[in-house]
A protein has these predicted regions:
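Transmembrane helix-loop junctions in multi-pass membrane proteins
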Residues: 2, 32-34, 61-76, 103, ...
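Membrane-interface segments at loop-to-transmembrane junctions
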Residues: 37-51, 109-124, 176-180
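Membrane-interface helix-loop junction between the first two transmembrane segments
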Residues: 21-43, 172-173
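Helix-coil boundary and N-terminal low-complexity module in membrane systems
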Residues: 2-15, 33, 45-47, 58, ...
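Transmembrane alpha-helical segments of multi-pass membrane transport proteins and ion-pumping complexes
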Residues: 13-25, 29, 65, 88-101, ...
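A generic, lipid-embedded transmembrane alpha helix
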Residues: 46-67, 126-133
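Alpha-helical transmembrane segments
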Residues: 4-19, 76-93, 144-162
């Protein structure tokens, strides 16, 4: 392995880290009333820890979708990472809003996570972020696609996720929201 490969690997790693930091900042921006330090350190809020870990894991999968596949060269890859990484962050946070509205519609998510420290809600949010991250990975992975195709596949994935969430509640003999 020569110096050129090491430097390009460090550049790719730095770009991934920059996208991850940007994703964290957007997470904080979307949840201004949340204090990450207070919830994790002072209040020892396991439900919030689950939500945050799910977001980070989903974001990691989404970033993986951006960098997976054949390289087009360092410059083109970095441009793709900027464009599709930003798109992945936006889609992941939009997914949280969509899923909170349609899958966990009977909950006040903020109250369940921050006040009640409901780990059941935290696990569902964790799973939604991971599923959405994998969805974004699949939407962004591969060759020949465009932003439009990525958004279409993401929309299809979100529709399936919401449908399955609603359908599951219909086929069970109890209201899933009561048991979370």
């Amino acid at each position: 392995m020569d110096l050129d490969h090491i430097l390009s690997s460090l550049i790719y790693l730095s770009a991934c880290f920059a996208v991850f930091v940007a994703g964290h900042m957007v997470f904080v921006l979307f949840r201004r009333s949340y204090s990450i330090k207070a919830e994790l350190v002072e209040k020892d809020n396991t439900a919030f820890a689950l939500v945050l870990c799910g977001y980070y894991l989903g974001l990691t999968f989404a970033i993986g979708g951006v960098i997976a596949g054949p390289s087009l060269g360092l410059e083109d890859d970095l441009i793709d990472m900027l464009i599709y990484g930003s798109l992945a962050i936006i889609l992941l946070n939009l997914s949280a809003l969509i899923n909170d509205r349609f899958i966990l519609s009977e909950f006040n998510i903020k109250k369940e996570i921050l006040q009640d420290k409901n780990c059941g809600t935290g696990v569902v949010e964790f799973a939604i972020f991971v599923a959405t991250g994998l969805n974004i990975y699949g939407a962004l992975y591969g060759q020949g696609g465009s932003i439009f195709t990525a958004i279409v596949f993401w929309l299809i994935g979100q529709a399936v996720l919401v449908f399955i969430g609603k359908y599951y509640n219909l086929i069970t003999h109890y209201n899933i929201h009561d048991h979370i």
